[in-house]
Amino acid sequence: MGTQGKVIKCKAAIAWKTGSPLCIEEIEVSPPKACEVRIQVIATCVCPTDINATDPKKKALFPVVLGHECAGIVESVGPGVTNFKPGDKVIPFFAPQCKRCKLCLSPLTNLCGKLRNFKYPTIDQELMEDRTSRFTCKGRSIYHFMGVSSFSQYTVVSEANLARVDDEANLERVCLIGCGFSSGYGAAINTAKVTPSSTCAVFGLGCVGLSAIIGCKIAGASRIIAIDINGEKFPKAKALGATDCLNPRELDKPVQDVITELTAGGVDYSLDCAGTAQTLKAAVDCTVLGWGSCTVVGAKVDKMTIPTVDVILGRSINGTFFGGWKSVDSVPNLVSDYKNKKFDLDLLVTHALPFESINDAIDLMKEGKSIRTILTF
């Protein structure tokens, strides 16, 4: 391509400061350096993590190009890159896999040593590995976000944060595999390890929670209880496999008590995809004593407490990062599974908008009116 080795000028949505709408700007994207790949973003989505990053309580650095769920096409590669070439369809992701570090070499985790700040993984990777940015706007250096920065027509990522996918992949659907779908689906399949004929409770029915329901159903769960304070999400949850839907605001007792009664003692597996203090407590309390397992998929609070006796009596709590998938190895397989109709991503997409309407997409999510909005350039 004629742009290889050159600075590219393109559109991007920049968060200049906390709490303000994103601004569509013209930015300059530098060529990739060693072990980096420059991508033309074809489709991207808004995830709650992008919105939460602008919260003043978070530690995000500004100005920043947000976005971390997308799919695109390789425009050019930096020195030393041999696994990608211009024209490849790719999915970047926030969970790197360098395949060299102690963590990557262990079968026990999907974490990678390239993450520098494990305490705040969602705001890590704000610069490239040489600690510089590939983005500039109006003479200012702009921070990256979670190693992806998909709210730009072009972005630069580490090859450890990228997977080549099927040439026939529908990028406007498989972009969900870059975060939301993989996180929820994998939480059920890989982390909770839901078993056939088991009972499950899924808290929070956004993209991650609905994807967890898909995972529970594919794993063979006999009963899947979906919980959310927005009842408008229940029809979609049932279409994806939920057998029961509960709105805690419409119950006369705590939702965990209702779930315990419905399942004669508690569910085998709970997955908290909402991450509030209330849902974390309920997700633990609704599991059966003896073997009940709670998987924490997302957390909006820094700490959670659990009575010691719960642990002694057999309840367990697991955390999951990117659904437990080793990203570079697993993402191509997930794309193939979608192509082979093992699961359907279409029900997770509620809106499609031009990239310039990104703030409308954010409003739709804040108002609980969308699951995923696909933005295209």
Swiss-Prot record:
<feature type="binding site">
    <location>
        <position position="112"/>
    </location>
    <ligand>
        <name>Zn(2+) 2</name>
    </ligand>
</feature>
<feature type="binding site">
    <location>
        <position position="98"/>
    </location>
    <ligand>
        <name>Zn(2+) 2</name>
    </ligand>
</feature>
<protein>
    <recommendedName>
        <fullName>All-trans-retinol dehydrogenase [NAD(+)] ADH4</fullName>
        <ecNumber>1.1.1.105</ecNumber>
    </recommendedName>
</protein>
<dbReference type="GO" id="GO:0004032">
    <property type="term" value="F:aldose reductase (NADPH) activity"/>
</dbReference>
<keyword id="KW-0560">Oxidoreductase</keyword>
<keyword id="KW-0443">Lipid metabolism</keyword>
<feature type="binding site">
    <location>
        <position position="49"/>
    </location>
    <ligand>
        <name>NAD(+)</name>
    </ligand>
</feature>
<dbReference type="InterPro" id="IPR002328">
    <property type="entry name" value="ADH_Zn_CS"/>
</dbReference>
<feature type="binding site">
    <location>
        <begin position="297"/>
        <end position="299"/>
    </location>
    <ligand>
        <name>NAD(+)</name>
    </ligand>
</feature>
<feature type="binding site">
    <location>
        <begin position="320"/>
        <end position="322"/>
    </location>
    <ligand>
        <name>NAD(+)</name>
    </ligand>
</feature>
<dbReference type="GO" id="GO:0005829">
    <property type="term" value="C:cytosol"/>
</dbReference>
<feature type="binding site">
    <location>
        <position position="228"/>
    </location>
    <ligand>
        <name>NAD(+)</name>
    </ligand>
</feature>
<dbReference type="GO" id="GO:0008270">
    <property type="term" value="F:zinc ion binding"/>
</dbReference>
<feature type="binding site">
    <location>
        <position position="68"/>
    </location>
    <ligand>
        <name>Zn(2+) 1</name>
    </ligand>
</feature>
<dbReference type="GO" id="GO:0051287">
    <property type="term" value="F:NAD binding"/>
</dbReference>
<dbReference type="GO" id="GO:1901661">
    <property type="term" value="P:quinone metabolic process"/>
</dbReference>
<dbReference type="InterPro" id="IPR036291">
    <property type="entry name" value="NAD(P)-bd_dom_sf"/>
</dbReference>
<feature type="binding site">
    <location>
        <position position="179"/>
    </location>
    <ligand>
        <name>Zn(2+) 1</name>
    </ligand>
</feature>
<dbReference type="GO" id="GO:0019841">
    <property type="term" value="F:retinol binding"/>
</dbReference>
<keyword id="KW-0520">NAD</keyword>
<dbReference type="GO" id="GO:0003960">
    <property type="term" value="F:NADPH:quinone reductase activity"/>
</dbReference>
<feature type="binding site">
    <location>
        <position position="101"/>
    </location>
    <ligand>
        <name>Zn(2+) 2</name>
    </ligand>
</feature>
<feature type="binding site">
    <location>
        <position position="104"/>
    </location>
    <ligand>
        <name>Zn(2+) 2</name>
    </ligand>
</feature>
<dbReference type="InterPro" id="IPR013154">
    <property type="entry name" value="ADH-like_N"/>
</dbReference>
<comment type="subunit">
    <text>Dimer.</text>
</comment>
<keyword id="KW-0963">Cytoplasm</keyword>
<dbReference type="GO" id="GO:0006081">
    <property type="term" value="P:aldehyde metabolic process"/>
</dbReference>
<dbReference type="GO" id="GO:0006067">
    <property type="term" value="P:ethanol metabolic process"/>
</dbReference>
<comment type="function">
    <text>Catalyzes the NAD-dependent oxidation of either all-trans-retinol or 9-cis-retinol. Also oxidizes long chain omega-hydroxy fatty acids, such as 20-HETE, producing both the intermediate aldehyde, 20-oxoarachidonate and the end product, a dicarboxylic acid, (5Z,8Z,11Z,14Z)-eicosatetraenedioate. Also catalyzes the reduction of benzoquinones.</text>
</comment>
<dbReference type="GO" id="GO:0010430">
    <property type="term" value="P:fatty acid omega-oxidation"/>
</dbReference>
<feature type="binding site">
    <location>
        <begin position="204"/>
        <end position="209"/>
    </location>
    <ligand>
        <name>NAD(+)</name>
    </ligand>
</feature>
<dbReference type="InterPro" id="IPR013149">
    <property type="entry name" value="ADH-like_C"/>
</dbReference>
<dbReference type="Pfam" id="PF00107">
    <property type="entry name" value="ADH_zinc_N"/>
</dbReference>
<keyword id="KW-0479">Metal-binding</keyword>
<feature type="binding site">
    <location>
        <position position="372"/>
    </location>
    <ligand>
        <name>NAD(+)</name>
    </ligand>
</feature>
<dbReference type="GO" id="GO:0004745">
    <property type="term" value="F:all-trans-retinol dehydrogenase (NAD+) activity"/>
</dbReference>
<dbReference type="GO" id="GO:0042572">
    <property type="term" value="P:retinol metabolic process"/>
</dbReference>
<dbReference type="GO" id="GO:0004022">
    <property type="term" value="F:alcohol dehydrogenase (NAD+) activity"/>
</dbReference>
<dbReference type="GO" id="GO:0046164">
    <property type="term" value="P:alcohol catabolic process"/>
</dbReference>
<dbReference type="InterPro" id="IPR011032">
    <property type="entry name" value="GroES-like_sf"/>
</dbReference>
<dbReference type="GO" id="GO:0005654">
    <property type="term" value="C:nucleoplasm"/>
</dbReference>
<comment type="similarity">
    <text>Belongs to the zinc-containing alcohol dehydrogenase family. Class-II subfamily.</text>
</comment>
